[in-house]
C-alpha cells in the first residue's frame, strides 16, 4: 500500500520523503507533521497518509493549486472534518510545536490553530479519502483497486517546477 502511495507522490515530479521515525514519538500523525516541517527546506509540505491508497495526482494537484492561489494551510473537509491529505506552509512549525507541548494531537485542532482553509471534494473524488486499516478494508480496497479506472498512469510524471514537498 505504501508503495502505491509513494508511486502516486513521485508521479507528481515533486520531491518525496517518507517519514519513518518521528522526532517526537507517540503523538500520532502530529509527530510526523512536526518532523516533516522541522526537517524540510521547502516553503510547504504536502502530507499524505500511509493508509489511503486511492489518492490521485489530480487531488494532489488541487491542493497545490489552492496553495499557489492563496498561500496558507489547506485541508480537505469531508463530513465536517479534516484529514489527509493536507498542505502546510513551513511557517506552521511553531503552531505544531505549541500543540505538541499542550498534548493536542488532533488534526482538527491543527486546522483551527493554523487558520487552515478548507475545501470539499466533488462526490466523484471522495472515494480517494478512504482509509485502509483492517484486513476487511484491505480486501475491499483490493477489489476496488482492480475495478478502478486509471485516468493518469502513475509512471507518467509531468515536468514542472515543484512548489511543495
Each PLM stretch: what is its role?
Residues 133-135, 157:
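Intrinsic disorder/low-complexity detector
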Amino acid at each position: 500500500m505504501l508503495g502505491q502511495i509513494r508511486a502516486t507522490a513521485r508521479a507528481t515530479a515533486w520531491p518525496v520523503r517518507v517519514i519513518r521515525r518521528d522526532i517526537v514519538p507517540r503523538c500520532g500523525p502530529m509527530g510526523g507533521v512536526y518532523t516533516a516541517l522541522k526537517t524540510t527546506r521547502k516553503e510547504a509540505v504536502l502530507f499524505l497518509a500511509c493508509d489511503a491508497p486511492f489518492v490521485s495526482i489530480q487531488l494532489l494537484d488541487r491542493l497545490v493549486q489552492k496553495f499557489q492561489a492563496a498561500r496558507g494551510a489547506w485541508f480537505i473537509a469531508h463530513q465536517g472534518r479534516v484529514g489527509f491529505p493536507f498542505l502546510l506552509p513551513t511557517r506552521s512549525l511553531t503552531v505544531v510545536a505549541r500543540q505538541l507541548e499542550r498534548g493536542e494531537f488532533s488534526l482538527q485542532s491543527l486546522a483551527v490553530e493554523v487558520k487552515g482553509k478548507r475545501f470539499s471534494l466533488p462526490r466523484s473524488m471522495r472515494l480517494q479519502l478512504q482509509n485502509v486499516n483492517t484486513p476487511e478494508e484491505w480486501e475491499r480496497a483490493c477489489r476496488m483497486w482492480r475495478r478502478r479506472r486509471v485516468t493518469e498512469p502513475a509512471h507518467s510524471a509531468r515536468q514542472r517546477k515543484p512548489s511543495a514537498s
